[in-house]
A protein has these predicted regions:
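Outer-membrane beta-barrel biogenesis signature
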Residues: 20-72
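Short, basic and Ser/Thr-rich N-terminal targeting/leader segments
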Residues: 56, 72, 87-88, 136
Length: 339
């Protein structure tokens, strides 16, 4: 069984490498709603974000909605990330199994820039006016274990981005499946994220006055007009991944993960990660993200988790660190409670 699992990991690695070396235009910066790509959970982030085949748990739903069908108990997750340039990212998820129906899931994602000074050519140090950039996504999902080996899930998201008095609102869908390949617990996961139509910004900040004929005199030189913005797609992403568990003893387990990614606004890449669990109390994690991506600025990730039971509930705290070539390192903390 271990040979089979290892061979499958190699297949995914080779596929991602072949895709990543292909000569293709990356289309970086050509999508809206890129905050949807910020992975919320510290567990997955510490594993290099190789999460499409992460074994069942509420933190896996972001990567693959199909894992929602594997959840066996109600759970609540809260995650906070100190993002670049003082930006904060917060995420709340709630999963509830309903006997005879399936599992339901709801989530709230919020990204906020804090106050930013308005600067103009005349006042480069600031006009005294401040504005904020705020992004919100509200999700509602459903997952079902179809057979003992196969589960699938679907999530709908209402997405809103606001820059001062200009905003865009749209709806996206996430869908995924996960399949257990053998009795050892090797999982194969596939997911599609942020599937939807194109969107564009509107708002009163786009209102201007317009002189239809600057050379004419006596006409209205301040006609009210509105600047139109182009429509852009959402940051779609395909994931295909494997997880391979290795049990050394009842008190020591290793989980290896690898996945290939195909985004619509960058080149193909690969994420890998490993998790070592000790005595169901402490977990050490490491990973590497966006391997083989053209001009990747990301790299190694590290983290840990501790868990324990209290009053019949399971509590888990996770931490993740991720490096960046040019910007500050990022830190995520996550709290999970399973009832």
């Amino acid at each position: 069984m271990r040979k089979v699992g290892f061979s499958l990991l190699i297949v995914v690695a080779c596929a991602a490498l072949a895709a990543g070396t292909a000569d293709a235009q990356t289309k970086v910066g050509s999508t809206l709603g890129t905050f949807l790509r910020i992975e919320p959970g510290a567990r997955g982030a510490a594993l290099g974000n190789a999460g499409s085949a992460l074994p069942g748990g509420i933190e896996a739903v972001y990567y693959n909605t199909g894992t929602l069908g594997l959840i066996e108990s109600s759970a609540v997750l809260y995650s906070h990330a100190d993002w670049f340039a003082g930006i904060s990212h917060d995420y709340v998820g709630v999963a509830i199994p309903i006997k005879g129906f399936g599992n339901v899931f709801t989530s709230v994602t919020a990204l906020n820039s804090g106050e930013i000074d308005v600067r103009t050519v005349e006042d480069p140090l600031g006009t005294g006016v401040k504005y904020t950039v705020s992004n919100v996504a509200l999700g509602l999902g459903y997952g079902l274990r179809v057979t003992e080996r196969f589960a699938a899930g679907l999530q709908m998201n209402y997405v809103s981005e606001k820059i001062w008095n200009t905003s865009q609102n749209t709806v996206t869908f996430n869908l995924g499946t996960i399949y257990r390949l053998n009795t050892a617990g090797t999982l194969l996961g596939f997911s599609m994220a942020n599937v939807g139509t194109q969107a564009h910004f509107t708002g009163r900040d786009l209102n201007i006055t317009y002189d239809q004929d600057p050379d004419a005199y006596g006409d209205n030189s301040a006609l009210p007009a509105e600047q139109s913005t182009d429509s852009f797609p959402l940051p779609g992403l395909f994931r295909l991944g494997l997880s391979w568990p290795v049990t050394f003893s009842e008190k020591s387990r290793l989980l290896l993960l690898a996945e290939g990614l195909h985004p619509n606004d960058n080149s193909e890449s690969m994420n890998v990660g490993a998790e070592w669990a000790l005595r169901d109390l402490l977990t050490l994690r490491a990973g590497y993200q966006t391997l083989f991506q053209t001009d990747s600025q990301l790299g190694p990730t590290f983290g840990f988790g501790v868990q324990g039971k209290l009053g019949g509930n399971l509590y888990r705290f996770d931490y993740a660190w991720a490096g960046h070539d040019y910007l500050d390192d990022t830190h995520r903390v996550t709290m999970v409670v399973e009832f």
